[in-house]
A protein has these predicted regions:
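Active-site-proximal alpha-helix that buttresses catalytic centers in soluble enzyme cores
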Residues: 2-204
Length: 204
């Protein structure tokens, strides 16, 4: 009997409306991988941040339609991947770390569907404790609860096929832009305390 396998694309998530911004921020700062403080102190600091930042964040979201575009693009990626019949995965879906559908909801649904193996694909090409570490930790916790085997594809941006494809698109864009075009590489930073704790994100 073959094992039913599913692939889950996992992203941070985002608010689908301005009403969801405060709960979204609260969920982020409740994560010890994001805000590594003792539980009570983390809750206190989280509430302070959310109270102070919600309105300014709402104003910025209103400039882009009042919701996160990440939701639309993640769903589009899943639909495109489903077009190609996978010889390995019977089902391809998505989950978010901080908004619905959450990893918890997705694992429960997969368990109900009889899936015994779940491969997690974080939608970040790098590895970082705060992002991919949080996702992998939560996935392992839920896999244990539902008796599902789980795997995580980590730091996939280092694969030579991905780099070659990115180079191809970049060269095409540079050729189209013409002489004088410049490429700006932008990356998230992480607190130095995380680097000292062994997070190798800067090396990526």
């Amino acid at each position: 009997m073959s094992v039913k396998q599913a692939l889950v694309l996992v992203n941070m998530g985002g608010p689908a409306s301005t009403e969801e911004i405060a709960p979204y921020m609260r969920a982020i700062f409740a994560d010890p991988f994001i805000l590594p403080l003792p539980w009570l102190l983390r809750g206190f600091v989280s509430n302070k941040i959310v109270k102070k930042r919600t309105q300014p964040v709402i104003e910025k979201y209103n400039l882009i339609g009042g919701k996160s575009p990440l939701l639309k693009w993640t769903e589009k990626q899943v639909k495109l991947m489903r077009r190609n019949d996978s010889p390995l995965f019977e089902h391809i879906t998505h989950a978010y770390r901080y908004t619905s559908p959450t990893l918890d909801q997705t694992f429960a649904s997969l368990k109900k569907g009889g899936y015994q193996s779940v491969t997690i694909l974080p939608m970040f090409p790098h590895s970082s404790r705060a992002m991919t570490g949080s996702i992998e930790h939560e996935a392992k916790r839920l896999a244990k609860r539902h008796s599902i085997t789980t795997y995580t594809i980590d730091a996939w941006g280092l694969h030579k096929e991905i780099i070659a494809l990115q180079s191809e698109y970049l060269k095409s864009a540079m050729d189209e832009a013409g002489t004088g075009a410049r490429v700006l590489f932008v990356a998230h930073g992480i607190p130095m305390r995380e680097v000292k704790r062994g997070d190798n994100y800067p090396d990526k």
